[in-house]
Amino acid sequence: MKVVVAIDSLKGSLSSLEAGQAIKEGVQVVYPEADVIVRPLADGGEGTVEALAIGMGGELVHVSVTGPLGEPVTAEYGILKADGTRPKTAIIEMSAAAGITLVPDEKRNPMHTTTFGVGELIKDAIDNGCRHFIVGIGGSATNDGGIGMLQALGYDFLDKDGAPVAYGGAGLQSIARIQAENVLPELKECTFRVACDVTNPLCGPMGSSAIYGPQKGATPEMVKELDEALLHYAELSKETFDHADRLYPGTGAAGGMGFAF
């Protein structure tokens, strides 16, 4: 008898492969002669990197990046080798560098948490030769509109005095100018496919701050301030980059990370 085990991860407990291995061991207790094959599975959230990288014959890369609180964390991403159908591809979960599970309950504050580490993951993958990206956005501790990620990739967000704005949602309202002169030149060679399961716009009553801000530690006052700051950021982005559209479905995903992409 042949048995194929493919199970999603059990959040905060077992990875897809760990859960599959446990089931395999149970099956073999009852059917010792069974040929049991374990394959990773994921739904785009936790465990997606491992599932795609291992399931498609890729490799896992570990790198130290800036975590959501500004402290170093070790994050993982996957690399798929180039073949006839795709260039060398990186698989990234933003939650590996900016996830809410990286922030203790008492420290959750989207005014200060940053996506800078996500940009560092992308930069590391570019340095490793990747030019196509599959990025899962979700499970974030952030509401910074993705500016942290963009800062790590060389975009400059400057205040009225020409100084870089602070990391986190607190820096959004201070943005007076966006400059792209220092962006990584390799970024022009890259393509991104964003994995997202929500359609929220960036701002407003169904926007990222109102819907997801409270679970990230935002008070009602913070939600109002963050929403106004994201609107300011979106309007300035539209002046700088004509294609920026804060109403596009999914731009409010992961604290506005969808808008950044």
Regions found by a protein language model. Name each.
Residues 1-137, 141-261:
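N-terminal loops that bind phosphate or other acidic moieties
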